């Protein structure tokens, strides 16, 4: 009998522990996400885009320098219909469809988007070297976390106004 009650207590403890939400998790619609993000870096690119060949390696170095798990790289690739479909799903899943629609068809830049408010904070393009990208992204993230308004003129005009 003692074994049975100890076993029941152990099973109950395991069940309770397995349903606990981690302290670092973000509760969303009664589920939790351990991988909650602060920023999305949306790279608008295509295989045939000459500026992309400059921007992408610099952006990769900048993100490697930052090593921030709360910054997510989101590729908006329009190289082919299949790539475009994947990009549309990525934008939809992250609720950044307005940015996707605004710049669909333009390439060679990355938009920095607040993952919480979905506000575009700024952009990086071929005029930025890797160190400047790192600094700009870090600054935009700090401003987003403090909920400060940003004024950034580095983003291109809308390709698809609406």
Tell what function each PLM region has.
Residues 68-90:
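Thiol-based oxidoreductase modules, predominantly thioredoxin-like and allied folds used
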Residues 7-18:
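Bacterial N-terminal signal peptides
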Residues 53-67:
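Typically the conserved alpha-helix immediately C-terminal to a functionally engaged Cys/Sec
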Residues 25-26, 132-162:
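Non-globular targeting/processing and membrane-anchoring segments
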Residues 23-39:
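A short beta-strand-turn-helix
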Residues 35-49:
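Short active-site neighborhood of thiol/selenol oxidoreductases, capturing the structured segment around
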Residues 104-146:
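Non-catalytic, surface beta->alpha helical segment in thiol-disulfide oxidoreductase systems
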Residues 85-116:
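Short, internal strand/loop/helix patches
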